[in-house]
């Protein structure tokens, strides 16, 4: 069955607009995806007709808002096949989720002389929190190097593990290269050494089904805004037994059981003890609508369509004169490139003149830029609403830029 891309595009109002007098070709979904009417309407309806502060309210609006929020927790748990909804913490996004793990689990479990393993392709959100933790604790940060094609040098991984390895923190899919890492093999190796595993799923959950039980990871984190949902909301999954042992990392309302000026404070049970303060309830409602939306289309069908479009894009871009493509042939979501010796910002600015939106810069992956020896790259990302015609416009735009700039 053909993927209904035109029907999907009709659900995204922003795709009807023009930029510089030309139809918008939005090729920046890896930074943040656009939102369908279903998400916009769900969040708007909540604020129009159902808004109230959640927790402890005895009135109808508060009770209904609380129920709606907890229903999204259950929905998200089914989406990633968690064993229980109580294994999911609402966070602002992937970055906060990783920082929560570093500051809660990490503070309790990392000691001087321990080590944490990451890779050279990580987003800063999966580098900096571990650097900060290691510096604070006197631990070591070890790095899996890359092959030139943008895949991990897995032959070096076993040697990085030892009896002081406490955590493997790895991206599911690179936000620059599109590399999908072989998580089952990597997690199995971590298990041999008794290490925990955190997976940054920010660039994975919108492209194919994720099953955290099958992966057997300890932590999995993703953001709503890359999944066609609102900004400011994400999900941190933690295995229940592990989550119950973790102390809170932020204090305030909603995360307590009792507070006494003389006897101290006791915490709420997990996951609520990790959700201090008033939550982003509207964002949570929007996230639920986004999960509904992609589920109704079928992640398998979305993935098949995106892979077909990716193959076409790689074939066509390879024909652009003087282009350098980064990353493996088999990839998800993104294509990073440079055009001759022209700076990525210049190329991106020209493309914007043609109504084409791409991301330029270091993509919050400065160590990866250093490995490739470039200050920046252009990145085109492909989502379920992109088309062959938009790829053709990108190719034509780059060819024109090459002719203009030489």
From Swiss-Prot:
Q: In which pathway does it act?
A: Cofactor biosynthesis; iron-sulfur cluster biosynthesis
> What range does the record give for the signal peptide?
none
Which residues does this entry mark as bearing N6-(pyridoxal phosphate)lysine? Answer: 226
Q: What is its EC number?
A: 2.8.1.7, 4.4.1.16
Q: Which molecular-function annotation in GO is an example for this chain?
A: cysteine desulfurase activity
CDD domains, per this entry?
SufS_like
Q: Where in the cell is it found?
A: Cytoplasm
* Protein name per the record: Cysteine desulfurase
What species does this protein belong to? Salmonella choleraesuis (strain SC-B67)
């Amino acid at each position: 069955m053909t993927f209904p891309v035109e029907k999907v595009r009709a659900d995204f109002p922003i795709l009807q607009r023009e930029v510089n007098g030309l139809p918008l070709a939005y090729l920046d979904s890896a930074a943040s995806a656009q939102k369908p009417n279903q998400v916009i309407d769900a969040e708007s309806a909540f604020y129009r007709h159902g808004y109230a502060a959640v927790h402890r309210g005895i009135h109808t609006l508060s009770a209904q808002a609380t129920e709606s929020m907890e229903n999204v927790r259950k929905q998200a748990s089914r989406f990633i096949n968690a064993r229980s909804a109580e294994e999911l913490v609402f966070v602002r996004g992937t970055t906060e989720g990783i920082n929560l793990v570093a500051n809660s689990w990490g503070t309790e479990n990392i000691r001087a002389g321990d080590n944490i393993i990451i890779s050279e392709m990580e987003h800063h959100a999966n580098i900096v929190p571990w650097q900060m933790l290691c510096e604070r604790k006197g631990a070591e940060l070890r790095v899996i190097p890359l092959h030139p094609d943008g895949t991990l040098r897995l032959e070096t991984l076993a040697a990085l593990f030892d009896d002081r390895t406490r955590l493997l923190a790895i991206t599911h899919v690179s936000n620059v290269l599109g590399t999908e890492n072989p998580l089952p093999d990597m997690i199995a190796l971590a298990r041999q050494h008794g290490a925990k595993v955190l997976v940054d799923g920010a660039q994975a959950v919108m492209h194919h089904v994720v099953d955290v039980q099958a992966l057997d990871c300890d932590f999995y984190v993703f953001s709503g805004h890359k999944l066609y949902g609102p900004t400011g909301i994400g999900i941190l999954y933690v295995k229940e037994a592990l989550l119950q042992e973790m102390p809170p990392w932020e204090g305030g309302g909603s995360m307590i059981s009792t507070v006494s000026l003389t006897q101290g404070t006791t915490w709420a049970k997990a996951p609520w003890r990790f959700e201090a303060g008033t939550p982003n309830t509207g964002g949570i409602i929007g996230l639920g609508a986004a999960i509904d939306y992609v589920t109704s289309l079928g992640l398998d069908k979305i993935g098949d369509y995106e892979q077909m479009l990716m193959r076409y894009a790689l074939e066509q871009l390879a024909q652009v004169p003087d282009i350098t493509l980064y990353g493996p042939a088999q990839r998800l979501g993104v294509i990073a490139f440079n055009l001759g010796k022209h700076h990525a910002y210049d190329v991106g600015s020209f493309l914007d003149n043609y109504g084409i939106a791409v991301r330029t810069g270091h993509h919050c992956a400065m160590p990866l830029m250093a490995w490739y020896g470039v200050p920046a790259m252009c990145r085109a990302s492909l989502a379920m609403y992109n088309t062959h015609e938009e790829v053709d416009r990108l190719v034509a735009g780059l060819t024109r830029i090459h002719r203009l700039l030489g």
